[in-house]
Amino acid sequence: MGVLVGPSGSPALEVDGAAVLGGRVIEKVFSQFSTNFSMTGNTISVPTAGANTVCGTTPTTAINTWAFSTADADGNTLANGQSITVTLIIDANSAATYGDGCTVDGNNVANGVQWSGGSPPLATSNTDILSFIVLKDGAGVVRVYGQGNTDFS
């Protein structure tokens, strides 16, 4: 049995156990391809409250650090034993290199993003799709796993 929770206008369904969906699952997309991602220096902000899929453009500078915010509309962040998957669809440029530094909710993540293949993907001048799993295990240890599919044209 599920329970509908959350603030007015931002409800969430909490389910303990399996959930079987008999049709399509449609996700909300946050932002627009023409919108610049929020950058401070060489740190890109990745908010997860709005949607699991975020699109935008990158500046012509290196992205050294990925700053994930897992807070929902009520300010609740990932609890122990929870994870979230977020996909960035980037109208990219090859000058915006991707790094592996990482924070989650303002806290440094030891070893940064653990990329598939061991290294960050190379940025391209076409569309790059980067997917991240932000995971907090039962003891509170946070890891971030990244996968890059690049050069869609």
Model-derived regions, located:
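C-terminal trimerization/auto-chaperone modules of long, extracellular attachment fibers and adhesins
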Residues: 1-21, 26
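Short, surface-exposed charged micro-motifs
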Residues: 12, 43, 131
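Exposed extracellular interaction/assembly regions and N-terminal maturation sites
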Residues: 18-105, 135-153
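Terminal beta-strand-rich extracellular "head" domains
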Residues: 103-124
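Extracellular disulfide-bonded cysteine-rich modules/repeats
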Residues: 126-135
